[in-house]
Amino acid sequence: MSSNKINKKSIARIAAVQAIYQNILQNNDDMDDIMQNVLSFYQNNNSITDLPENLKISLSISHFKMLVKSVFENIHKLDEIIDNHLTNDKDPAHMPILLRALLRVSICELLFCPTTPAKVVINEYTDIANDMLNEHEIGFVNSVLDKIAKEHIRLI
């Protein structure tokens, strides 16, 4: 039986979205506590119950920690960017928590991780959005990331 693996950075991105979601939902600003909770979940594959038997999940701990720390360090700038991309009829206070968490992490990686090509960031987070958000929100994520990439001259 062959072993299947998912890219470690892809898992780190999902885990970072989960950590930031937890931060927002629990109003918990203890970054180390949040990171430890999420890491312990991923380090114990037994806690993930609906995986195929031969699928191995592991994440890039360094990429995960870098993403979460960068979001915490830049949270006000990230929220300002997100809010500036909302249409006039959208109230930032009513943005779904999961959408805000995904946008915080994805925009953070787009802006503060110059080693990751913009196209990769956009594709990865659009794929993550496909698994977590509704169709309208997926399009919004793709549109916002594309605009930010172009605004910051990291052309695709």
Curated annotation (Swiss-Prot):
Transmembrane segments: none
GO cellular component, one term: cytosol
Sample GO molecular function, one term: RNA binding
A biological process term (GO) from this entry: DNA-templated transcription termination
CDD domains: Terminator_NusB (cd00619)
Keyword annotations: RNA-binding, Transcription, Transcription antitermination, Transcription regulation
UniProt function note: Involved in transcription antitermination. Required for transcription of ribosomal RNA (rRNA) genes. Binds specifically to the boxA antiterminator sequence of the ribosomal RNA (rrn) operons.
PANTHER family for the chain: ANTITERMINATION NUSB DOMAIN-CONTAINING PROTEIN (PTHR11078:SF3), N UTILIZATION SUBSTANCE PROTEIN B-RELATED (PTHR11078)
Recorded family membership: Belongs to the NusB family.
Name by which UniProt lists this protein: Transcription antitermination protein NusB
Species whose genome carries this gene: Rickettsia africae (strain ESF-5)
Lineage, opening ranks: Bacteria, Pseudomonadati, Pseudomonadota, Alphaproteobacteria, Rickettsiales
Gene: nusB
